[in-house]
A protein has these predicted regions:
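Short, glycine-rich nucleotide/cofactor-binding loops
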Residues: 187-192, 373-380
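Catalytic-core elements of nucleic-acid end-processing and repair enzymes
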Residues: 439
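Helical hairpin unit composed of two closely spaced alpha helices linked by a short loop
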Residues: 376-398, 402, 407-409
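Histidine/acidic-residue-rich catalytic or RNA/ligand-binding cores of hydrolases
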Residues: 382-384, 411-413, 443-446, 461
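Short, solvent-exposed amphipathic alpha-helical segments in soluble enzyme
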Residues: 312, 386-390, 416
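Active-site donor-binding acidic/aromatic loop of nucleotide-activated sugar
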Residues: 428-432
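N-terminal localization/anchoring segments of enzymes in phospholipid and broader phosphate metabolism
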Residues: 1-357, 361, 365, 405, ...
C-alpha cells in the first residue's frame, strides 16, 4: 500500500538528517580505526595502514587520470590520501560516475528540447540578422545554435537589479495569470514571501488556471514543509519534487540538483536569474547583510526558450500536459532590435557543457570591458586562463564577489585565485553591504548573460542550470 504524501515527505526528512550525520560519524570511524589498530594490532599496524594507504593511492591515481575538472578531482583525492578510511567510504558512496549514470537514466531530460523545423528556420534567419547587426557576436550565437538553443528576436528584456523587485513583479503577474503558471526553483522557502506567493498560486489554481511547480528536494529539506506542499495540491496546484532524497544512503545526492530559477506566465512572460523564492532574496530577513541579487523578465518570442525547458523537464519527470505543446507558445511578439538566446545545461551534457563554453566565448570576445558578478568563484584552468588573457590584453575586467559570504569555505577557495587575477590586471571587488548572489556577465555594453549559473564546477558540470 502506498504511503500518504505527507508521511513520505516526513520520512525523507528524517532519513536525510540521519544520512547527513553519517558524514560526521565517518570521521570518528577514522579516528577509532587508528586507535584500535594501534592498541590491539600494534604489531601489524604498519602493514595494515600501509595497505590501506596503498589502496588510497591507487584510487587517487585513478581519480586523477579521469577526465573532468582538476579542482573537483583534487577535492576527492585529498581526503582519500589523508583520511583514507573516511575518504574511500565517501567516494564509494557518492563519488565516481555511478550517480551521474543513474540520473541520466532516471531524471535527465534531453537537452535541448526537440523543436519543429519552422523554429529552426526562424532561428537561422535571426542568426543572419545578428551577423549583419553585430558580427562580433555571431560566433557565440552560432555555438549555442549548434547545440540546439535557438536565437529569438521580437523579445523585450527587462533587467531587474534587486530580488525584491523581481519577486514583486512575479507576484503581480501571477495574480493576473489567465491560462497557466509554470515555476521551477531550487528553493521554495516558507516565510512572509511564500505566504503571499502560495495564496496567489492557490487562488489562481482554484480559478481554473493551470499551475505547475517543480522544486528541488535537497534544496528544501529544512525549508518547505509537507503541510505547505499539501496546501498547494489541495488547491489544484500540480507539484513535482525533483530528484527526491532517497531512502538509501548512496542516493543522497548533494550534487545533480535542479538549480534553475524559472517562472513562466501564460506563455507571454518569463523570468530567470539568481533569485529563489525565499525571504532573504527580498531582504525581508537579514542573512549575511544586504542580499543583492538580480534577474530578467522576458516578453515575446524568447519566452518559449524557458517555457520549453520547463515543459521538457515536467514531461520527463512524469508530469502530464493537459494541452498540446503549441498551446503554451507565446502569442505576442513586441518589435525590438535586440536578440535573445536562452540556453540550458545539465550533467547529461558532459563533457560538452554549454554554460562554461559560452562563458569562455563571452570572455574571449570582450574588446573593451568585461564585468562579472558571481557568489561563488571556483574556476577551472580554462576560465582562469581566459580571464588572465583578457586582463593582459587590455580589457577592463572586473569581478565582483560577496563581501559577506554565506559559506566561508567557498569564499576561502575564491580568495586563493585573487592574487593571480590581480597579477594579470583583473580588478576584483567585494560587495561590502553584504552577500552578492547575482550571476551576470556584461560585455562591451552589447551582450549580457543573466541566469542561475555560478562560476564553479557544480554549476558547470553537476547541476541543472
Amino acid at each position: 500500500m502506498k504511503k500518504p504524501r505527507l508521511q513520505q515527505r516526513g520520512e525523507r526528512r528524517i532519513a536525510a538528517a540521519l544520512r547527513i550525520a553519517l558524514a560526521a560519524a565517518l570521521l570518528a570511524v577514522q579516528v577509532l580505526f587508528v586507535v584500535l589498530t594501534t592498541r590491539y594490532l600494534k604489531d601489524h599496524f604498519a602493514l595494515i595502514y600501509g595497505a590501506l594507504e596503498g589502496i588510497a593511492l591507487i584510487t587517487a591515481l585513478y581519480i586523477y587520470n579521469k577526465p573532468g575538472d582538476l579542482s573537483y578531482r583534487v577535492a576527492w583525492i585529498i581526503p582519500i590520501l589523508f583520511v583514507p578510511v573516511v575518504g574511500l567510504i565517501l567516494y564509494l558512496l557518492w563519488g565516481g560516475d555511478t550517480q551521474r549514470k543513474r540520473l541520466q537514466r532516471q531524471t535527465a531530460p534531453k537537452l535541448p528540447p526537440e523543436e519543429p523545423e519552422s523554429l529552426r528556420n526562424r532561428s537561422a534567419l535571426n542568426a543572419d540578422r545578428l551577423q549583419r547587426a553585430l558580427p562580433g557576436w555571431s560566433r557565440v550565437s552560432q555555438y549555442l545554435s549548434s547545440r540546439g538553443f535557438y536565437l529569438y528576436q521580437n523579445t523585450k528584456a527587462v533587467y531587474l537589479p534587486e530580488g525584491a523587485l523581481l519577486l514583486e513583479d512575479i507576484l503581480g503577474r501571477i495574480k493576473a495569470a489567465e491560462r497557466f503558471i509554470f515555476m521551477e526553483y531550487f528553493i521554495l522557502a516558507e516565510g512572509k514571501l511564500w505566504d503571499r506567493m502560495s495564496a496567489a498560486l492557490c487562488e489562481r489554481a482554484r480559478s481554473g488556471v493551470e499551475v505547475k511547480i517543480i522544486f528541488d528536494d535537497f534544496g528544501n529539506i529544512k525549508r518547505f514543509s509537507a503541510e505547505s506542499l499539501q496546501t498547494l495540491r489541495d488547491a489544484g496546484v500540480e507539484v513535482i519534487v525533483f530528484n527526491p532524497v532517497h531512502e538509501y544512503v548512496n542516493r543522497l545526492y548533494f550534487n545533480y540538483r535542479d538549480h534553475r530559477k524559472i517562472t513562466v506566465i501564460d506563455g507571454e512572460t518569463a523570468y530567470t536569474g539568481g533569485v529563489n523564492i525565499a525571504d532573504e532574496y527580498a531582504n525581508l530577513i537579514d542573512r549575511f547583510g544586504y542580499w543583492k541579487d538580480s534577474g530578467i523578465r522576458l516578453e515575446g518570442e524568447g519566452v518559449w526558450g524557458l517555457t520549453a525547458a520547463f515543459l521538457n523537464m515536467w514531461s520527463f519527470l512524469g508530469g502530464e500536459l493537459h494541452e498540446e505543446r503549441d498551446y503554451y507558445r507565446p502569442h505576442t511578439s513586441p518589435a525590438t532590435d535586440g536578440f535573445c538566446q536562452p540556453f540550458l545545461d545539465g550533467p547529461q551534457n558532459n563533457p560538452d557543457n554549454p554554460a562554461e563554453d559560452t562563458f569562455l566565448q563571452l570572455i574571449g570576445s570582450a574588446r573593451r570591458f568585461l564585468y562579472i558578478t558571481t557568489p561563488y568563484f571556483i574556476p577551472d584552468e580554462n576560465i582562469m586562463r581566459a580571464l588572465c588573457i583578457a586582463g593582459d590584453g587590455g580589457v577592463d575586467v572586473r569581478l565582483m564577489l560577496p563581501g559577506t559570504p554565506d559559506h566561508w569555505y567557498a569564499d576561502a577557495v575564491a580568495d586563493s585565485y585573487i592574487g593571480e587575477l590581480l597579477e594579470h590586471h583583473v580588478k576584483v571587488y567585494r560587495y561590502t553591504p553584504g552577500f552578492l548572489h547575482a550571476k551576470s556577465i556584461m560585455v562591451d555594453r552589447e551582450t549580457a548573460f543573466v541566469g542561475s549559473v555560478n562560476f564553479d564546477y557544480r554549476s558547470f558540470e553537476l547541476h541543472y542550470e
